[in-house]
Amino acid sequence: KAKKLFQFEEKDIAQIELKNSEGMLSLQKDKDVWKMLKPVEAKADKASCDSLAGDLASVKVDRTLEEPNINWKNFGLDPAAIRLTVKLNGGKTHELELGEKDFSSSSVFARVPGQNKVLVLASTLLQSDANKKVIEFRDKSVLEFQRDQLKALDVVRKDKEFKFEQGEVPRAWTPD
């Protein structure tokens, strides 16, 4: 039976550092808001960050391979394709390196630095999230506002202009 690798919950995560083929990415969580610290300081995409954090908190080890002289290259772990560092609210840190998928592509090889064993992780969701491009972790909002604060909207397109105002009934928009 697969067992949980790390003994923390998603809510305990304060920071995630991710190194993949894209480079280094650093994400920090303050209450419920994610912020990108590296490669640039910017607001982060909540869904992408929550997904990665959830995968890290719930990742399970399907089986463990322990041999006296492990050839890490055979598992894509020398060097590792992906390196993750998780910092918890209490200050504790956890690290994980991800390598290749197994022959069935349903599991991924991994290791905790300093441990002389290959972990076979039960899911490749973590690998998929950790392989995302930096842009996928950035907030893509063009304008930020609370929906109930919006009273009117003007849309200008070439030779046409559209004006909308909120009516008496909430969510009822009428052309001006």
Where are these predicted regions, by residue range?
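A short-motif feature that recognizes glycine-rich, charge-decorated loops
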Residues: 1-176
